[in-house]
Amino acid sequence: MELIKEIETSRNSSVLLKAIFEGDDAPTLLVKKQSQITEYLKENVAYVYLGKKSEFGYKDAYEFARDLAENCARSYQLDLTTFVTEKLCIKGVVDAFTKGINFSAFQYYNLKTFTKRVNENSLSFYLENISQDVLNVFKKALILVDAQNFARNLGVTPPNELNSEQLAEIIRKDFKKYHNLKVKVLERKQIELLGMDLLLSVNKGSVYEPRVVIIEYKGNPSSQEKTVLVGKGITFDSGGYSLKPPKFMLGMKYDMSGSAIVAAVMKAIAQLKPNKNVSAIMCITDNRINGDASLPDSVYTSMSGKTVEVNNTDAEGRLVLADRLYYGATKLNATRLIDTATLTGTMLTALGQTYSGIYATSCKIWHQFEDAAKIAHEKVWRMPLHEDFNKTNKESLVADLNNYSNNEKSDCNTAAMFLKEFTNNVPYIHCDVAGTADKKGMGLGILVSTFVEFGKSQQRNCESCECDEQKCETKNCNIEESTTKIVKAKKSTAKKATTKKTTTRKTASKTKSTKSKARK
């Protein structure tokens, strides 16, 4: 099946697929079963039953679109306006359907010699009148899902086809077409000169050279504000001498998901061209064993000068991230730092495969990130970044820090505190996507859209939207507005409400006093 590339304003020869809800005037013989399609081929039309209209929102539209693209048995042209509900405006329909269909229709890396027959049916969009706002939403959705698929494709590629050197070269070549991006690849000698010994310690067991890829976008050169994204890029994680059991080693090609995500974000940023400064750092190596691989109990000096005792070579992710965070804070002059990594197994235990675990150094930066996730329709959950979790990071008798402790049962929390040690007090977000980066052997490109929105600092504003502001789930359906304005508006509303309550209390008090005097 081909990807969606345009919205058509006239009918084509495909069957027109319309949404129908509970209580709507239904044609005869309509099958009223959730997501069931009933076809009336003489009229060249079909209806999909979607239950209660009041309950059909963005998530339902997205999941329907994904399922339709995966199981499409006929070519359909979707009548987009029929899917609009009080929870979902036309922009939300366009956004959800574009992302859902192109997610499922994407042809990722595959070396199978015998594959099932390619679905030759097609899906297309029909919207008689397209406003510029709707067209902008459509174009943005295409860019975001393309970036998401880019990250997914890198993730699914096997480790013998995508080592550290190959991944860096792919980024270098692929990003040449974006003239507003500056790509710099650091090789071993440059990494050594910078004193990134934590990355080099992980790379000691590899037959491939480490790479640090720096991607910079300057959308506002006059501003000192800069968001720096850091992605873990372990192209395969055997655990090193702290060797993983075989069943836990499968799927470790996805341990580079963090780097794939931040690269995909920069791909989208280059096309969306926000008036912001955003950079990304990919720290790339594999973690394997040879005669010179890092041994448990070894001590290394980080770029920051802090020494680290490596108690567990399978806790390598925090080592490669630490040097990159410090680089982002001190060399790239970040004013906001954010990293993403498939970091800890305890995060999978804590939140499963539903929510990505998020750590934030302040409520302000957390709310900025949470707003971005809401716009992107991705599930995030704030985790505790508390000094109590840092105690076991400082148990070493021979170094400033240790990278792992058997005395701490919530390793996702201690790992976050370990990384915070290298942020140079820059406002910081840490995203542990160990449970959400991939599912059933397939990469999801998780948080790509959230990171893009976070980098753009986009906020919701439904003032001129045709949907019900209180019920609309589209989130990004209108004009961008700064966090400051929204916070001020909320505070102003709260202040007015408080004043109103106070006035009411005073009035009530006077009334009570008058009644009291009357009794007397």
Curated annotation (Swiss-Prot):
State the Gene Ontology terms under molecular function: manganese ion binding; metalloaminopeptidase activity
Concerning SUPFAM superfamilies, the annotation shows: Macro domain-like, Zn-dependent exopeptidases
Catalytic positions?
K244, R318
What are the GO cellular component annotations?
A: cytoplasm
Query: Where does the UniProt annotation locate this protein?
Result: Cytoplasm
Which domain of life, per UniProt? Bacteria
Sites where the protein binds Mn(2+) 1 = D237, D314, E316
What cofactor requirement does the entry state?
Answer: Mn(2+)
* Binding-site residues, Mn(2+) 2: K232, D237, D255, E316
Cofactor binding annotation: Binds 2 manganese ions per subunit.
List its EC numbers.
3.4.11.1, 3.4.11.10
Catalysis: reaction(s) = Release of an N-terminal amino acid, Xaa-|-Yaa-, in which Xaa is preferably Leu, but may be other amino acids including Pro although not Arg or Lys, and Yaa may be Pro. Amino acid amides and methyl esters are also readily hydrolyzed, but rates on arylamides are exceedingly low; Release of an N-terminal amino acid, preferentially leucine, but not glutamic or aspartic acids
* Region annotation Disordered: where it falls in the sequence: 488-520
| Broad class of where this protein is predominantly found | cytoplasm
**Could you tell me what this protein does?**
Presumably involved in the processing and regular turnover of intracellular proteins. Catalyzes the removal of unsubstituted N-terminal amino acids from various peptides.
Q: Which family does this protein fall into?
A: Belongs to the peptidase M17 family.
Q: What is the name of the protein in this document?
A: Probable cytosol aminopeptidase
Name the species this protein comes from: Metamycoplasma salivarium
Gene it is expressed from: pepA
